[in-house]
Design a protein with these regions (language model features):
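Extracellular/periplasmic periplasmic-binding protein-like sensory domains
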Residues: 1-31, 111-118, 125-126, 138
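Processing junctions and N-termini across compartments
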Residues: 134-135
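Segments of small-molecule ligand-sensing domains
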Residues: 12-25, 32, 36-109
């Protein structure tokens, strides 16, 4: 993998080389890729310059990772396409089951998609309770471009 060739072979990796490719390592790499792609998205709108936090948030809320882009980035099979918005910071609710076989984690299922009819009411209820407890006024996504 490129990460082994360009990072670990040069002694620049922060994790143990044997952790490369494991589920928790991959989650970190995916999260980093999403952050970079959000910045790229924001720079397409605001210019190729240092961005403000608000501009990066705009990039996250307008991120559209297609299957083609995921493949181009070398992440095919690691995540499903996702499209984020002000109202949906997840972008997708897909997951797979991993199982430890005593030596390594192995994917043992196809992709599952969360049931929004169950999940979204729970998310909204929990978010509203948190906002009330912390005295936070939630953003009105109808006013966001």
């Amino acid at each position: 993998a490129d990460i082994e060739k360009f990072v670990y072979a040069k002694g620049a990796g922060a994790a143990k080389p044997e952790d490369v490719g494991h589920v928790l390592y991959n989650r970190g790499v995916i999260d980093s890729m999403i952050g970079v792609e959000a910045i790229r998205t924001a720079q397409k709108k605001f210019g190729n310059k240092p961005l403000t936090g608000e501009q990066v948030r705009w990039g996250l809320e307008n991120l559209d990772l297609t299957a083609e882009r995921i493949k181009e980035l070398g992440f095919e099979g690691m995540l499903q396409p996702l499209k984020m918005s002000c109202a949906d910071h997840e972008g997708a609710r897909h997951s797979r089951v991993h199982q430890w076989d005593g030596k390594e984690w192995k994917v043992i299922s196809d992709w599952y998609e969360g049931d929004d009819s169950i999940l979204l009411p729970l998310v909204k209820e929990t978010a509203a309770a948190y906002a009330k407890e912390k005295n936070i006024t939630p953003r009105d996504c109808s006013k966001v471009e």
